[in-house]
């Protein structure tokens, strides 16, 4: 699905097909070692979460995407302390957490949000707000403050 190895099979655009949890797991695994920058539509933002985000940054967002480059960036830095399945929680975290703030950092001139929660320790997802094409949140990076009691 992600890497169309058979050119005779017409590939559906990434923004049409929302990945299942199993497809997301495969996408993350392939992205960690791949060299291309593939994109994946991984979930929708529920209305309550969309309202919280709009109240914080003033922008409407509806969907969540991952780019393999952001996955590689998040996992290649040892200081990020990520577990193998951390990115599989991203949609649930965005839709349920109330700890959202505008980041001091921008990505490609777009505003970013820091979305923090506790999944066996504090984890932060830095999401770029892309208002084009109906409004998307895209992962920039992800990190844990500690892992297994260790501190940075």
Locate predicted features.
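Ribonuclease/tRNase effector modules and their secretory precursors
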Residues: 1-152
């Amino acid at each position: 699905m992600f890497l169309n190895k058979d050119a005779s099979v017409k590939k559906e655009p990434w923004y049409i097909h929302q990945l299942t949890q199993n497809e997301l797991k495969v996408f993350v695994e392939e992205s960690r070692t791949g060299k291309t920058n593939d994109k994946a539509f991984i979930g929708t933002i529920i209305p309550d979460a969309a309202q919280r985000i709009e109240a914080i940054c003033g922008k409407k967002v509806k969907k969540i995407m991952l780019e393999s480059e952001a996955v590689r960036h998040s996992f290649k830095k040892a200081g990020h302390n990520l577990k193998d399945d951390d990115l599989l929680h991203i949609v649930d975290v965005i839709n349920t957490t109330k700890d959202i703030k505008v980041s001091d950092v921008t990505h490609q001139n777009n505003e970013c949000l820091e979305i923090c929660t506790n999944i066996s320790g504090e984890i932060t997802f830095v999401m770029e707000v892309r208002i084009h094409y109906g409004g998307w949140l895209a992962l920039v990076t992800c990190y844990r403050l500690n892992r297994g009691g260790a501190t940075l």
